[in-house]
């Protein structure tokens, strides 16, 4: 298979428990929190501006392993290490439900584009639930090792799951829970998966000795292309809402490619430790990365320039999600909190 990025169809994409103001942080690579003040109501010490306000969403009893926002921006879904699935009404700041799951080891959480379904990577399975009440409708059984990543097709009819342990990609029919196909030939430990916005392809990333990005036809499941081997583990992938760019977390680098011609747009060194996860804002402005240092870095999607570093979490930051307008970022971490970052000032 040739190393290339297949040409994609281009289109225009259609056009925020307990809340406490925690701190202010500022753009600039050297921004840092005031370490001498243990009080959470602090202001970062820096001369840069404008400010980025952050709120704490606390009350969780387990590490935040995955989170996501419904497409309408009304609800936040949170998966925690104590096997709880929690849905929060963001407008009313109320918990809609918090349910204990019989499965654990939550690794990823996807929400369908119509906002009706949750798919949760848990143990060797994928738990499919209704968003509105948390009712489990299907358990997708077939993987023989921990499921690392999960994604809905844009029409919500197909779920793709990947496991770095069993080195398979599995495609499921959402409505019936039936396994459509298993992809296992010549695969490395695949841990991330994302669909293109037009639904024509899904893209996977691998760790281990493989360290390649693979492109798959979402209808025939044919392998369309494989990238050159990357210099580090591919810990996360995201496609911009306009379908033009692929962004990846490769070790501690943020990389972006033009999907039309495979041209690398930028490769930027981020934190000193590995990046855990990556997210692209729906307004095509920002790339957010979270790392093992407990910090979040925001990059300009146009040129890869670092815009700001967000500090405040204690421990690894494991999950990120943007609001639909791209002005708010949600982060979940080992410290059992979700932080809500107001990025609107960055665009001024």
Curated annotation (Swiss-Prot):
Disulfide bonds, paired cysteine numbers: none
Mapped WD repeat ranges: 59-98, 142-182, 185-226, 229-267, 270-309, 312-347
UniProt superkingdom: Bacteria
GO cellular component: outer membrane-bounded periplasmic space
SMART domains: WD40 (SM00320)
CDD domains hit by this protein: WD40
Keywords on record: Repeat, WD repeat
Signal sequence interval, chain numbering: none
PANTHER family recorded: TRANSCRIPTION INITIATION FACTOR TFIID, TRANSCRIPTION INITIATION FACTOR TFIID SUBUNIT 5
Name used for this protein in its record: Uncharacterized WD repeat-containing protein sll1491
